[in-house]
Amino acid sequence: MNESSEANDLAIRRQIIDETKCVVVKVGTRVLTTSDGKLDLERVDRLAEQLCRIADTGRQTIMVSSGAVGAGVAKLGLPQRPTDLKSLQAIAAIGQADLIGAYEKSLQKRGRHAAQVLLTRNDLRRRSGYLHVRNALNGIDELGAIAVVNENDSVAVSELKTTFGDNDRLAAQVAGLFNDVMLILLTDVSALYDGHPDEKDSQPIHMVHDVDDGVMALVDDQVSTVSKGGMGGKLRASKLANSHGHPTIIGSGTEEFVLDRIFAGDAVGTLFVPPKRSLKGRRRWIGSSANVAGTLFLDQGAVDAIQKHGRSLLAIGIQRVEGTFAHGNVVRLVGPNGEEFGRGLSNYRSHEVARIAGKPSEQIEWILGHRPYENVIHRNNLVLRIVPE
């Protein structure tokens, strides 16, 4: 990095820090456990110390912490992480107690408390649940506590591998509840590299403006026996956070006082800079958290009207309906190429859309006996930039 680009990097980092009102820090299993699989209490304590310093600046501070299953495996003295659902659920419950206890002990001696928040994806799929979670996190902050969020592995079923996918995505979705957020993903590598981190010629990438296919191609994702995420998952989480307007830093959680360095404006890790335009409010929920209840397959004319001209979706542009959904449910939009390009809130139920598909709007009342809406999805309830799960 030359001097001018380094100065620009640092200036952008300082501006982001100045604008940040909420900080979401995610720390992975491999950062929180020792080489023999036990919970690293010293590292938990150092992280808690830095979280308190961030909170002392007046910023809302949220920790998304992995490690429950790993802590449970260590506590029970198991030789390896089980793969069956029943064991994983029980071990997560046992390990979560140790995990939250370690945070509480470290935070309490610094005048704060840990507030355990366990989530599944269903908690964020409904708009009401999405708002309830946000209100709860705000309430925790108002009491001066620090929320420690984890996926609720102990009651998840298939969710152990498919709810959020991993805690990186969970952290990005928690960040999406708020505005003016910085997301920090702490892992066991110092940054995103232009090659394999272990290769001597590989160089760290200090700043990324677009998580495109070229950036994704840099990682060879490996999911370990003690964690569910990988660098690919962190890039997808960064892209999701960026779509909300939130800058993201991927850095080393094993580096001592890494959070202090980030907020000192040092060039730590890789900074993912969001675009100027980003999803807000309800459209953010539609695009990243809401449950998708069905699919509408559109002709090219409808795709062009939506993508190029910002139009609402009319019934005449729908070729086929898949799934069962109600009025107000989120549906995905698929073009003739078979690829999803957007999501939106349907004004009609699935069986109604199937009946009016391909028909002009003026025929809706004749077909259904009523026409509460001229369009199937209003443009204000459409989101085109979708981050793949």
Curated annotation (Swiss-Prot):
Keywords: Amino-acid biosynthesis, ATP-binding, Cytoplasm, Kinase, Nucleotide-binding, Proline biosynthesis, Transferase. Residues 293-371 form the PUA domain. PROSITE patterns: GLUTAMATE_5_KINASE, PUA. SUPFAM superfamilies: Carbamate kinase-like, PUA domain-like. GO terms for biological process: L-proline biosynthetic process; proline biosynthetic process. Its EC number is 2.7.2.11. InterPro entries: AceGlu_kinase-like_sf, Asp/Glu/Uridylate_kinase, G5K_ProB, Glu/AcGlu_kinase, Glu_5kinase, Glu_5kinase/COase_Synthase, Glutamate_5-kinase_CS, PUA. It holds the Pfam family PUA. Gene3D superfamilies: Acetylglutamate kinase-like, PUA domain. It is an enzyme of class 2 (transferase). It is found in: Cytoplasm. GO terms for molecular function: ATP binding; glutamate 5-kinase activity; RNA binding. The keyword Ribonucleoprotein does not apply. The keyword Translocase does not apply. GO terms for cellular component: cytosol. ATP binds at K26, T187, D188. Substrate binds at S66, D153, N167. Pathway: Amino-acid biosynthesis; L-proline biosynthesis; L-glutamate 5-semialdehyde from L-glutamate: step 1/2. SMART domains: PUA. It catalyses: L-glutamate + ATP = L-glutamyl 5-phosphate + ADP. Belongs to the glutamate 5-kinase family. Catalyzes the transfer of a phosphate group to glutamate to form L-glutamate 5-phosphate. This is Glutamate 5-kinase. It comes from Rhodopirellula baltica (strain DSM 10527 / NCIMB 13988 / SH1).
